[in-house]
């Protein structure tokens, strides 16, 4: 049966900050499929938001032009390094469902692991690359998986991973949390919400950093006609 792609993004700001340094965007690929871009700018507040929006805009523009994900990551890094002279960093993720190659590709310059859930198993894949912007020859880490029904991928920024640290708790083991809820049959949106709610709870309802969770799932469908749906909810201060 054909596949259906579900993407859910849940995010919130650092406590008492009106602007989030995290930016997440979804873009349709010219060859078919979707890409999700997540940028976590250094720091928080207006400066971090300006940085993350600038980098995500550049990435989205290149993806729409058909540039390959790895080249996009390098170009965004080169731009940041050239203009900020290695003094400003950002975490940068692209996760794509590429219909040309029938694969899911994660291209990452990040500090947090990626959670992969397939065939009933949940695995936490540590990143092998650091953030962009600091060193001239920084390269992304690339993970490629077959695009098949039942695959679920969870990405999150470092605010999720460190949730609870300032309250004296250990870091948030997202992989273990996913294992604990995997029998509940959660949708992408429900899983993203559950992870975000748990991170906020661990921070005593006062997030110590910007928090972003992205969940991408692949499932089978028998829809006719094919209807694409997209919705966004943004509560205003």
How does the language model describe each region?
Residues 122-123, 129-130, 134, 174-177, ...:
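Small-residue (GG/TT-enriched) beta-loop-alpha framework at ligand/catalytic clefts
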Residues 40-41, 111, 156-160, 210:
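DG-centered beta-turn motif at the end of beta-strands
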Residues 49-119, 126, 138-140, 192-216:
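Catalytic core of PPM/PP2C metal-dependent serine/threonine phosphatase domains
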Residues 22-79, 167-171:
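Primarily the active-site beta-strand->alpha-helix module of PP2C/PPM metal-dependent phosphatases
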Residues 44-65, 152-203, 222, 228-231, ...:
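Active-site-proximal, acidic helix/loop segment immediately C-terminal to a metal-coordinating Asp/Glu
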Residues 17-34, 90-92, 125-170:
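Acidic loop->beta-strand submotif enriched in PP2C/PPM serine/threonine phosphatases
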Residues 123-125, 143-145, 226-237:
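Generic detection of short hydrophobic beta-strand segments and adjacent strand-loop junctions
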Residues 1-20:
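Regulatory cytosolic signal-relay segments
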């Amino acid at each position: 049966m054909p596949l259906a792609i579900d993407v859910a993004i849940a995010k919130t700001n650092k406590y008492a900050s009106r602007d989030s340094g995290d930016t997440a965007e979804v873009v349709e690929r010219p060859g078919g499929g979707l890409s999700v871009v997540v940028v976590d700018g250094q720091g928080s507040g207006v400066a971090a938001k300006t940085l993350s929006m600038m980098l995500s805009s550049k990435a989205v523009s290149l993806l729409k032009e058909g540039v390959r994900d790895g080249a996009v990551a390098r170009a965004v890094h080169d731009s940041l390094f050239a203009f900020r002279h290695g003094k400003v960093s950002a975490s940068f993720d692209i996760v794509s469902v590429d219909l040309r190659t029938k694969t899911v590709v994660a291209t990452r310059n990040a500090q947090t692991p990626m959670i992969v859930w397939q065939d009933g198993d949940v695995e936490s894949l540590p990143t092998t690359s650091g953030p962009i912007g600091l060193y001239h020859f920084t390269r992304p880490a690339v993970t490629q998986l077959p695009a098949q029904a039942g695959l679920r991928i969870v990405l999150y920024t470092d605010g999720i991973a460190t949730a609870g640290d300032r309250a004296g708790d250990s870091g948030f083991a997202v992989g273990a949390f996913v294992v604990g809820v995997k029998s509940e049959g959660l949708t992408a949106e429900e899983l993203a919400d559950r992870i975000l709610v748990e991170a906020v709870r661990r921070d005593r309802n006062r997030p110590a950093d910007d928090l972003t969770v992205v969940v991408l799932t692949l499932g089978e469908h028998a829809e006719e006609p094919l209807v694409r749906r997209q919705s966004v909810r943004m509560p205003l201060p």
